[in-house]
Regions:
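Long, intrinsically disordered low-complexity tandem-repeat segments
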Residues: 221-235, 242-253
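Acidic, metal/ion-handling microdomains and their immediate structural contexts
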Residues: 168
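Cytosolic, membrane-interface loops and tails of multi-pass inner-membrane proteins
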Residues: 174-176, 252-260
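Hydrophobic cores of alpha-helical transmembrane segments in multi-pass integral membrane proteins
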Residues: 4-124, 138-165, 175-219, 244, ...
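Short, charged amphipathic alpha-helical segments flanked by flexible coils
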Residues: 296-298
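Alpha-helical transmembrane segments and their interfaces in multipass membrane proteins
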Residues: 126-133
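Short amphipathic alpha-helical coupling elements at transmembrane boundaries
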Residues: 129, 260-267
Length: 370
């Protein structure tokens, strides 16, 4: 039985499924009618997870040890971890935004392992004596699970910042068109003719045609209006007042869409990072114990150890600000976004570029061959 061909086939099938699912989630985020097929996409995530599980099992059978001894195996396990987190979070929260965030990182991680690494790095190899320990499964598995949780939580935070940025960038245009409004007298209400058909979705004050309006629509329109009028229930045909200093989405009942998405992302980020941090702590401690058994020292400030400690500090600061200071929203999201970069440096950057006990030496070997 050619285990390598089977593993390659399983990896390629998993990639194809994840690619199709990622496209589905992106389309679903823009066209709500396709949501009726969401259960099929969720089944696809489960199928990809099963295929990756089989890939790891075949690898385990071939090597006679847990398949986390090189970069390729760790990438496969990381992609499996992303799909597992996706399944768990969507089952718990039933939030459809999870697929939009997690499916790309699952796909790209698997693609890097399948298509970017040279074939010799994808083939199974025997363990060096220092790695022939039960600590391999304990330490490396927990560290990879912590990476997956921390990266996922940081991605939620990064998406929160993106939505906040575009919301704030859009605000000067949507909220009031200040240049158009400042000439109006703000101390009193003023009378204008308002018809719903005349509201331009891009600019509420543009293309205002009085000839198409009806006399009964005349009324006082204040610059600022009550929250009830901003809820989207106001109707000019009933003589209700529509707000001037608000966005078109608010006029038609979608004012809270961004707010709900941001709240959802903030909560998902907090809870996922709250899971990843203790896993990282346990992984670092187990690694220290294993290092003492293998090399006689708990801590040697190896580049991997140093960056793992930096990663731990970043997320410790994040949780401290959330729990102790009560921070929410942009500030902790910025910290988590920094953590996203630091985690990837700790996982890939150090392993590929540096020399140390945790180095894979791929880049160094390529450089030496040039």
């Amino acid at each position: 039985m050619d285990f390598f061909k089977i593993q390659t086939l399983l990896g390629n099938f998993s990639f194809s499924i994840l690619f199709i699912i990622m496209l589905f989630f992106f389309i679903e985020s823009n066209f709500k009618w396709i949501s009726k097929f969401h259960s099929l996409a969720f089944f696809g995530i489960i199928l990809a997870n099963i295929l990756l599980t089989l890939l790891l099992l075949f690898r385990w059978i071939e090597e006679n040890h847990f398949p986390l001894s090189n970069l390729y195996e760790s990438l496969i396990f990381l992609s499996w971890s992303f799909t597992t987190i996706h399944i768990i979070l969507e089952k718990i929260t039933n939030s459809k935004i999870i697929g939009v965030v997690i499916s790309p990182i699952s796909l790209f991680t698997l693609a890097f392992g399948n298509f970017s690494l040279p074939p010799e790095m994808q083939k199974a190899s025997s363990l060096v004596p220092a790695l022939q320990s039960n600590w391999l499964m304990m330490h490396v598995t927990i560290m990879m699970l912590s990476y997956a949780a921390l990266i996922t939580g940081s991605l939620f935070a990064f998406c929160f910042l993106i939505i906040t940025h575009f919301e704030n960038k859009k605000a000067p245009q949507d909220f009031g068109y200040i240049n158009d409004v400042t000439s109006l007298e703000t101390s009193t209400s003023f009378n204008i003719v308002l018809d719903k058909k005349s509201i331009n979705l891009i600019n509420p004050l543009k293309n205002f045609d009085k000839s198409e309006t009806k006399p009964e629509v005349f009324g006082a329109l204040p610059l600022l209006t009550s929250p009830s009028a901003m809820s989207g229930n106001a109707s000019p045909q009933r003589g209700d007042q529509l707000p001037l200093l608000t966005s078109p989405s608010a006029m038609y009942g979608n004012a809270n869409d961004y707010s709900k998405i941001k709240t959802n992302l903030d909560n998902l980020s907090y809870r996922t990072l709250g899971l990843g941090f203790p896993l990282l702590t346990i992984g670092i401690l187990s690694g220290a114990v294993w290092a003492n058994e293998a090399w006689g020292s708990y801590w040697s400030w190896d580049p991997k150890e140093t960056w793992a400690f930096i990663t731990w500090l970043i997320y410790a600061i994040y949780l401290h600000t959330r729990i102790t200071k009560g921070w929410q929203g942009t500030k902790p999201a910025l910290i988590a976004s920094i953590g996203f970069i630091v985690v990837w440096i700790c996982y890939l950057g150090v392993n590929l570029l540096s020399k140390g006990l945790h180095s894979y030496g791929w880049v160094q070997s390529i450089t030496n061959n040039l």
